Amino acid sequence: VDALIVISLPPTEEEFDSMLNLGIPVSLVGMHHKRCSSVAIDDVASSRTATQHLVNQGHKKIGLMSGRPDDPFNFSVPQDRRKGFMQALAENGLEWVPSREVHGDFTMHTASRAMDDLLARPNRPTAIFCESDEMAFGAMQAARRHGLKVPDDISIIGFDGHEMAEYSDLTTMEQPVQLMGEMAAWSIMERIRKPSAEPHSLVLPTTLVVRNSTRR
């Protein structure tokens, strides 16, 4: 093995030590760490943009479908996306109502059940930001099950740019996944050519892709 690319899930410090002790270049995709090169997005700013889109559509009662608070991996992405959501609410002077938050584990199945729970609560939101497209798909499925039309009765926005988002007509924050992989590979090749090169972190932009799952 000449190099190692680690995607999404953050290694523990012990795992980092083991990888770096291999003496080969290591690059992270989807997260940052000061000890090696990385390529990622700004999850906080991107989530703020997604939430601002809902605010711009006139929504004031905005819900959040976030990752599990008891995540055993202590993954920073759900926390950062929640932080961006909260920042957008605060910047627009909107009250945060804790009962408008439900949790999934970034799968369609758990998101669908979480959305069932949210829609059964009083004073339900008129829009919801889902921290992933997979969870947004589950939310859309549950909304239909409750006799709600998306976006007429509730607006839903996701995050990631899943390949099925276009077919589901889902508004989403799209990550440049292919470019992230290309830049990680480029970073690895640079370190192979110049082993003494310092690790560096790249932050790539995301794109708000507006489709028909959000409306005023």
Question: Where is each model-derived feature located?
Answer:
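Conserved phosphotransfer active-site motifs of two-component signaling proteins
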Residues: 11
